[in-house]
Amino acid sequence: ISNNYDLTQGQTLVIEKFSNIYTTRDITSENLTIEQIRDASLDEIKEISNMSYEILFNSNKEVWSNYWNDQNIVIEGNDYDQLAIRFAQYHLKVMTPSHDNRCGIAAKGLSGEGYKGHSFWDTEIFILPFYTYSKPEIARKLLEYRYLSIGGARKKAKDNGYEGAMYPWESAWLEDGEVTPVWGAVDIVTGKSTKIWSGFIEQHITSDITFAIWQYYMVTNDEDFMEKYGYEIMFDTAIFWASRLEWDEIKQRYHINEVIGPDEYKEHVDNDAFTNWLAYWTIETAINYYNKLKE
């Protein structure tokens, strides 16, 4: 498409471009053909092309105004701290798929393509508490994502000789299972690709998810969620850890050997404190709730 314009000195030409994005994975596109999705996209473009930039801008402005009025955090102090919390809240808002429980939060958010948009333990430990306390309905959807992808966790446990649910270190689409790359960048010393061990032995994410479920339940008392999703995840992750433990006959105790803890620079660790404690907590918590439910 080409156009020619003759402008006089000082005259301004304004070009407005309207675009939208539709994918076959959108909830509204689940039962549509490619042609139907294309037509829906074009229909929307035709509709908004009749609106001015000001109308669309004000519509966007209203959405953000409602957000800040609803969830604004005010820090009494220097402006930098207020800017920092605003910056964090902005990214939490734009990178959270709050409309769709089939998606998790990408580790890099929308700031880059690092980790290919995969979800890590960052969601449950660092991000979820914000929503648990401010927007529990969004926190629930993020936890539902873990339930909807439990099939991949069960498959990973089985493939590794364990029972229950062993959650992937990196998660993507619901049926994908473990998506952590096996090989990374070339080591400048050896000249060979570096093996990425986290997908194999960084296993604390299984407990991280259960802890997040428990925390959400403690704050919201959402029994409906627990009965539909929470208890099942809790019990399956406890079963995994019970099968993962290694008995030491000499010392008469269990070990969890060959793991990576939160410090990813330390690989092949035996009895990492963080991993061990949360594994113990997961089993203990599951037993307590099992006994309560029996009553």
Listing of model-derived features with the role each one plays in the protein:
Residues 86-93, 113-117, 121-132, 197-216, ...:
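Contiguous, well-ordered alpha-helical segments that form the cores/surfaces of helical PPI scaffolds
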Residues 77, 111-121, 193-206, 263-276:
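Solvent-exposed loop and edge beta-strand segments that line ligand/cofactor-binding
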Residues 96-111, 137-211, 217, 224-228, ...:
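Helix-terminus loop motifs that line ligand-binding clefts
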Residues 82, 136, 140, 207, ...:
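Non-membrane alpha-helical structural segments and their capping/turn regions in soluble enzymes
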Residues 240-295:
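Acidic/histidine-rich catalytic neighborhood
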Residues 1-115:
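Acidic/polar, glycine-enriched structural segments that form the non-catalytic walls/loops
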Residues 69-74, 91-94, 125-136, 209-223, ...:
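Well-ordered alpha-helical scaffold segments within catalytic/enzyme domains
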